[in-house]
Design a protein with these regions (language model features):
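Conserved beta-strand hairpin/beta-sheet module of binuclear metal-dependent hydrolase folds
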Residues: 315-387, 508-522
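Bacterial N-terminal signal peptides
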Residues: 5-16
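Metal-dependent catalytic neighborhoods of phosphoester/phosphodiester hydrolases
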Residues: 419-429, 581, 617-619
Length: 644
């Protein structure tokens, strides 16, 4: 049990430290200083093994298929090209590491360490006791890290990580993994033990270690980057997704002909390949873990659900600029709040409308009507009408005005979870028409905007479904590819784009051009496969969903190192950026291509479902129960492709 032995030895050394050393009371007994320039000395695993070599990685079947089918060149596509190395690989990439201290200006305590690598963002490790963000907060390449001293070892816990790779040679991670690091300094040597716990792709945690040597002459350079990579990513197609169909990757075993030091069976990885007894026994006779030993594998469903909490409450997450994300019992609502009032993208379910209204009122009061005190005090304050200012006068002059009402509601589709609050919120809103409210018969409700096809579904739904009440219907519709709102709202242009034949025939996305935020509607969900209405009246298709996601990627721009920048709010789940949307697009594209190949091979729907073309993604997005199951998604993909 080699890797577990490393962990047990480490923990035993920590536990055996004297109590006084563990308490670290007093500045004279403070923890060791980790700051400085560190040169990579050695690590137990090569940074880039041959493609298909997963020896020692505790992969399950889903992780193995994900790695087999993902082409390494995918990291050269425009959405990923400038990303830093994934968190598990950063300690083992080229170059050394620079660790900087952030000190409290009064106590001189270390509030945080900042770690920098050759190809990385600045990675803070907070030591000030702050909590980790909620599950619906965005993920990043470096994640969110907090540290705590245990003896002379800094134990770092990192969450909110994007999907990436364990090693550059193909082994993949999901975006649900956590990483625990043990950083121990002994004189001029820094030992880093990392434990990756991925409940989607691994049966057990994956342990690695690395050694650095202190070297003040080491230079940690920053790698330059440009995002253009069309030659690598499919010629002139900017949306090309490099991947292999299951069983058709020709590069997984070609290296074994020259490097025959390892049996092919061992290259497939798995929990059993971590242990010494695997080397001594026939691969066919080795054990497999009876139960998942990953600390989070048994809770993965709860971890995913936490990205879209269904607790009957409304949670508010500031996004960027004027924009906020309201998580309303599992459904996301986008709110633009400012001096012009409130613009909502979708209104949630009918049962949540009162709590949504209360949350919107609170936001409008806090953001749009908040007092703006004069920071100057005294008789000579410039710009003050009274010639002087004081806290008391500020309170009088800048007392809160009433919150501005809801002016606009934009529905990205006719789905009940997006239109359930339309009737009540629109009636309580205000949008002056025809010169004001004194015109007889002119309604002053909020303006409700949607695509014409969404109005048709709300007013005359197919089958036996009841129509929405007329007061919930859109008051303004558009027919073309997009519609610009006729004036700025809260200081920015708002553009509504049609996503034809996507989830339905009436889907829209909404782009807030100054805040750099896109509300994606049902095109994006970080907790499920996309819903696709393939009925004749529904008009949805898998290709339309992919096209809609590609449109979002065309509009969005990453801020730096392939993350941040334009934020994308999904219909359900956590806040996303361009790399997250690309990962979701890639997943759907890979599944589409697999199902299309099966159709070309003459397989029936039942045979395709039994073949599990979604195997490597089911643990992350699949479901066997509820309103939208994995089988229903596969059927929608199959039928939308078979009809073309």
């Amino acid at each position: 049990m080699a890797r577990n032995s490393v962990l047990l030895l480490l923990l035993s050394l920590v536990a055996s430290a004297p109590a006084s050393a563990q308490l670290l009371v007093g500045r004279e007994r403070s923890p060791p200083d980790l700051s400085g320039e560190w040169r990579l000395e050695s690590d137990e695993d090569p940074g880039q093994p041959p493609l298909g070599d997963y020896l020692g990685i505790p992969y399950n079947d889903a992780g193995r298929q994900r790695s087999d089918t993902t082409a390494e060149s995918i990291w050269g596509t425009s959405e990923y090209r400038c990303r830093p190395h994934s968190a598990p690989h950063q300690w083992r990439g080229l170059g050394g590491a620079r660790i900087l201290k952030e000190l409290d200006p009064l106590t001189r305590d270390v509030n945080a360490y900042h770690v920098q690598f050759w190809r990385s963002l600045d990675r803070p490790i907070y030591l000030d006791g702050r909590p980790h963000p909620p599950a619906y907060a965005p993920h990043s390449w470096t994640g969110f890290s907090t540290g705590e001293w245990v003896g002379n070892t800094l134990v770092v816990t990192t969450t909110h990580l994007k999907d990436g790779f364990l090693k550059r040679g193909g082994p993949q991670t999901s975006d649900m993994y956590t990483m625990t690091e043990y950083l121990t300094r002994n004189d001029d040597y820094l030992t880093v033990v990392t434990i990756v716990d991925d409940p989607i792709y691994m049966d057990e945690p994956y342990v690695q270690s690395t050694t650095y040597e202190y070297d003040p002459n080491t230079i940690v350079q920053m790698e330059s980057c440009v995002t253009s990579a069309l030659g690598e990513a499919g010629g002139t197609d900017p949306h090309f997704v490099p991947h292999f169909l299951p069983g058709q990757n020709p590069y997984l075993t070609e290296w074994l002909g020259e490097q025959d030091w390892i049996p092919e069976a061992a290259t497939r990885g798995g929990a059993q390949t971590q242990y010494p007894e695997y080397v001594l026994a026939s691969p066919s006779g080795t054990r497999r873990a009876a139960l998942p030993l990953s600390r989070s594998a048994l809770d993965v469903g709860r971890m995913i659900a936490a990205q879209s909490p269904r607790d009957g409450e409304v949670h508010v997450l500031p996004v960027q600029g004027n924009i906020y994300m309201l998580v309303a019992d599992g459904t996301n609502i986008t709110a633009s709040v400012g001096p012009d009032g409130v613009l909502l993208v979708n209104t949630g379910t009918a049962v949540m409308v009162d709590k949504v209204r209360a949350a919107v009122d609170a936001l409008a009061t806090e953001v749009a009507a908040a007092p703006r005190p004069n920071p100057c005090a005294g008789a000579n304050c410039a710009g003050n009408a009274h010639g002087w200012a004081s806290p008391a006068m500020n309170a009088i002059v800048a007392s809160p005005a009433p919150a501005r009402p809801i002016r606009y509601i934009i529905n990205t589709s006719a789905a009940p979870e997006h239109t359930g609050g339309n009737a009540k919120l629109a009636v309580e809103g205000f949008f002056a028409r025809r010169g004001g409210t004194n015109v007889t018969g002119a309604a002053a409700n909020a303006s409700v905007i949607a695509h014409e096809n969404a109005l048709a579904t709300m007013s005359a739904p197919p089958g036996d479904a009841a129509p929405l009440p007329p007061e919930a219907w859109p008051t303004d519709t558009y027919f073309y590819d997009f519609q610009k709102l006729s004036e700025y709202v809260n200081g920015e242009a708002v553009i509504v784009y049609h996503a034809p034949a996507a989830n339905t025939d009436g889907d829209s996305i909404v782009f807030f051009r100054h805040s750099e935020v896109i509300s994606a509607g049902n095109l994006l969900s970080t907790v499920s496969y996309p819903f696709i209405d393939i009925d004749i009246d529904g008009g949805g298709s898998v290709q339309g969903v992919i096209d809609g996601l590609n449109h979002i990627l065309d509009l969005a721009v990453a801020e730096y190192r392939s993350q941040g920048g334009t934020w994308i709010i999904p219909s359900h789940g956590r806040l996303a950026d361009t790399a997250d949307v690309a990962s979701y697009r890639n997943m759907i594209t890979m599944i589409r291509d697999r199902v299309r190949q099966m159709i070309d091979d003459g397989m029936t729907l039942e045979q395709v479902i039994a073949a599990r073309p979604t195997l490597d993604f089911d643990g992350r997005y699949g479901s066997t129960q509820g309103e939208w199951t994995t089988d229903m998604f596969v059927e929608a993909v199959y039928e939308s492709l078979a009809r073309r």
